[in-house]
């Protein structure tokens, strides 16, 4: 008799646990289904940013009308050959930029914050921010899904192993890596002219799936980034240029808005929110 009662008790407990598990699974299924349906209605957006978005934050573009960077030839401070000729000069050049970036006055502007809000709304599966900038203002504004195709100023790299390290101080020719059997001198984690940009496979994959491509603060004279708009159009994406003035590839864009980045980007993102929330709206309008 006792064995029978114990058996019934175990059976009730088993059924209760099974019922709770079924209920949990059902709730989880409907939650995921709802989330998927919501995400399916969101556009896939790729954003490209250039120096123009950070100019209002006090970041110098460095390139003057005569082609010099802070009175240095580009060939001397932004090429592998220049680094091999005079590594001390190159380190000094980027040390100055690194110090400037970390000044308290250098902060994100409304354009950076607007893009962070857009990413938060769309979710990482529907949003990729590709930047040509080597500053960290997108991160400071709250953006997460960022691809720095030209590297990052606050990082250094071992040229032998390819490992990347955080670095906020000055870098000298006597700073070596600790990741190799025979340590190599660390170099700025910057993509110089003549080197392959970072993450190109991921970028082209995102462009092939994009519904909307937005270029912000770009000049249109540096490839391969200048060709992204063409790639996006080939797969049917709507293309938008938000710039202080027309870029060299402005004819490739279907929609254009010109003015300070802090104004035109914020205004366009708010417009985009309205379009997304209107089921009858057309993103191309």
Curated annotation (Swiss-Prot):
Tell me the Gene3D superfamilies matching this sequence.
SIR2/SIRT2 'Small Domain (3.30.1600.10), TPP-binding domain (3.40.50.1220)
Supply the CDD domains for this chain: SIRT5_Af1_CobB
Q: Where is the active site?
A: 150 (proton acceptor)
Name the positions where Zn(2+) binds.
158, 177
Q: Which key words tag this protein in UniProt?
A: Cytoplasm, Metal-binding, NAD, Transferase, Zinc
- Residue ranges of domain Deacetylase sirtuin-type in the record: 10-285
Q: What is its EC number?
A: 2.3.1.286
Q: From which residue to which does the signal peptide run?
A: none
GO cellular component annotations of the record: cytoplasm
Which residues does substrate bind?
Answer: 94, 97
Where it mainly occurs, coarsely classed, is cytoplasm
Quoted from the entry, the domain comment is: 2 residues (Tyr-94 and Arg-97) present in a large hydrophobic pocket are probably involved in substrate specificity. They are important for deacylation activity, but dispensable for deacetylation activity.
Name recorded for this polypeptide:
NAD-dependent protein deacylase
- Origin organism lineage: Bacteria, Pseudomonadati, Pseudomonadota, Gammaproteobacteria, Enterobacterales
């Amino acid at each position: 008799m006792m064995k029978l009662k114990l058996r019934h008790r175990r059976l009730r407990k088993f059924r209760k646990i099974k019922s709770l598990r079924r209920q949990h699974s059902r709730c989880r299924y409907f939650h995921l289904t709802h989330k998927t349906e919501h995400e399916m209605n969101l556009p896939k957006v790729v954003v490209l940013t250039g120096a123009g978005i950070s100019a209002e934050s006090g970041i110098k573009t460095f390139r003057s009308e005569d082609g010099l960077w802070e009175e240095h030839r580009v060939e001397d401070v932004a090429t592998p050959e220049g680094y091999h000729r005079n590594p001390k000069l190159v380190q000094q050049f980027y040390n100055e930029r690194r110090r400037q970036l970390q000044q308290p006055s250098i902060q994100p502007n409304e354009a950076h914050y607007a893009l962070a809000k857009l990413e938060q709304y769309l979710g990482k599966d529907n949003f990729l921010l590709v930047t040509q900038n080597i500053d960290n203002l997108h991160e400071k504004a709250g953006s997460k899904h960022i691809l720095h195709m030209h590297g990052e100023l606050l990082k250094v790299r071992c040229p032998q192993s390819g490992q990347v390290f955080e670095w906020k101080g000055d870098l000298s020719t006597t700073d070596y890596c600790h990741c190799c059997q025979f340590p190599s001198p660390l170099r700025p984690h910057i993509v110089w002219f003549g080197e392959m940009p970072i993450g190109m496979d991921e970028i082209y994959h995102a462009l092939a799936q994009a519904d909307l491509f937005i270029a912000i603060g770009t000049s249109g004279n540096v490839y391969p980034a200048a060709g992204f708009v063409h790639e996006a159009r080939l797969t049917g994406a709507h293309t938008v240029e938000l710039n202080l003035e027309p870029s060299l590839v402005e004819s490739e864009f279907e929609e254009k808005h010109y003015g300070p980045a802090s104004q035109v980007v914020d205004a366009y993102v708010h417009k985009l929110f309205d379009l997304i929330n209107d089921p009858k709206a057309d993103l191309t309008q």
